[in-house]
Amino acid sequence: MKRSKTLRAADAKVDREKLYAPLEAVRLAKETSATKFDSTVEVAFRLGVDPRKADQMVRGTVNLPHGTGKTARVLVFATGDRAAAAEAAGADIVGDDELINEIAKGNRLNEFDAVVATPDLMGKVGRLGRVLGPRGLMPNPKTGTVTMDVAKAVTEIKGGKIEFRVDKHSNLHFIIGKVSFSDEKLVENYAAALDEIIRLKPSAAKGRYIKKAALSTTMGPGIQLDSNRTRNLLVEEDPAAV
C-alpha cells in the first residue's frame, strides 16, 4: 500500500543505533512526518524510578513557553463568584452539584482535557476519582488544579501549562508542539519539559535517572534522543551546519 511505503521510507531515514541531539532530532522528525495534517510532536521518557513506591513518584506541571499547539478545554467545579471568574477566564464547562453528578455517570467525558476545582467542592468531587483518575484528570493541590484562584488556573492551562505523571511502567509522555512549529520553539518546549523532570528527581531514585528519551510525530518513527544533552540545546553543535 502507498501508505505503508511512505511509513517504511520515513523509518529508513532514522538510525536506530544513534542518539540524536535535540535540534537534529526535531529536524529529522519533521522530515519523516508521514501525515497530511499538522502532526503532533511528542517526547517520551523512560525514568529510573519505581512508581509503585510513593517516594519515587514523579508528578508535576510545566509551562511550555510556546504551548502545545492545541488550546486545552477546561472544566471547572465552582460556585458563585468563583464560577463566574472561571467563565470569564475562558473555562469551557463550569458547574457544581449537577455537573458532578453528570460526570459521575460518565457523561461529557470527551468534552474536556483538564479539570480544576475549588477546595470547598473537593469533598464531592472526590467521588469522581474512579472516572477522572484513570484519565489523569483528577484535580490535585500539588498541580495547582485545586485552588480558589480558578481564573489563574484556567489561564495557565489555556496558555500551555500541562500536567504529567509517570505511569506504572516508569514512562512519561509530553506533547511539545506541532510539526508547523519552528525548530527553535520545539527544542525550547522540550528543554522546559526536561528541566522540570530533572528538577523533580526523587532523592530515593538510584542509578541513572533518565534511561531513555525519544521524539516522534503522529505515526512517525521514534527518534532516540541523547538525554545527556540537557543544557544549551540551541547552541550545541548543529550537525546540519558541520
Swiss-Prot record:
Protein name: Large ribosomal subunit protein uL1
InterPro entries given in the database record: Ribosom_uL1_bac-type, Ribosomal_uL1, Ribosomal_uL1-like, Ribosomal_uL1/biogenesis, Ribosomal_uL1_3-a/b-sand, Ribosomal_uL1_CS
Reported function: Binds directly to 23S rRNA. The L1 stalk is quite mobile in the ribosome, and is involved in E site tRNA release.
Pfam family, one: Ribosomal_L1
Subunit structure of this chain's protein: Part of the 50S ribosomal subunit.
Domain of life from the UniProt record: Bacteria
Gene behind this protein: rplA
GO-annotated cellular components: large ribosomal subunit
GO molecular function, one term: tRNA binding
Membership in a protein family: Belongs to the universal ribosomal protein uL1 family.
Keyword vocabulary terms for this entry: Repressor, Ribonucleoprotein, Ribosomal protein, RNA-binding, rRNA-binding, Translation regulation, tRNA-binding
GO biological process terms held by the UniProt record: regulation of translation; translation
